[in-house]
A protein has these predicted regions:
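Residues forming the flavin
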Residues: 1-184
Length: 184
């Protein structure tokens, strides 16, 4: 609550965002990250343990290009329209309009086509997630909502392999949590 989206980039020519708020949490708006599941099938290209890192970097490079080095933003209504135009969705869905508002961002931003950042399968999953959230929080998927991205660092892009009892190839080591690639 009362938060902002900030540029959290750590590499030249790439852009990642993250949400933050001051301790008082008294800003005018709130923000939330809508996360989609990404599996190796979404990004396997080189068949190396670092494929997830390469994919993350590709998304961040796409975001950097989309916003010309600034945080790329787009109204949800336009995002949906672009997905329909590209055949990713059959029809647009966005909730009843809420009162328009300014994006709660810190740093420079630029309006852009966010559908160019992720592959079609992830854009579709994102839109489905927004629709599902709107069933729980009315207005969540309003066409007036500002999207910005990409928040690509919610979990490690490298997953440590585990066996059937969740142990790594080193006896007694049980990888878990975000750092091991097992968020959620």
């Amino acid at each position: 609550p009362g938060g902002y989206v900030v540029n959290a980039s750590s590499e030249e020519g790439r852009l990642a965002v993250n949400g933050m708020s001051y301790s008082d949490r008294d800003g005018d708006c709130a923000n939330s990250a809508v996360i989609v599941s990404v599996s190796p099938e979404d990004y396997k290209t080189r068949d190396t343990p670092l494929d997830g890192v390469f994919f993350q970097r590709e998304l961040e490079q796409n975001a950097y290009r989309a916003g010309n080095g600034k945080i790329p933003i787009q109204k949800y209504r336009e995002f949906q329209k672009n997905l329909v135009d590209r055949g990713v969705l059959e029809k647009a869905f966005y909730a009843e309009a809420i009162e328009p508002f300014s994006p709660a961002l810190m740093g420079q931003y630029e309006q852009a086509d966010l559908t160019d950042i992720m592959p079609a399968s992830l854009n579709r999953a994102f839109a489905e997630g927004m629709e599902e959230m709107n069933r729980k929080i009315r207005g969540f998927a309003s066409g007036e909502v500002w999207l910005c991205g990409v928040e690509s660092r919610t979990s490690s892009p490298i997953r440590i392999d585990r066996d059937d009892v969740l142990q790594s190839n080193i006896e007694g080591i049980y990888p878990c949590g975000e750092g091991a690639g097992y968020a959620g």
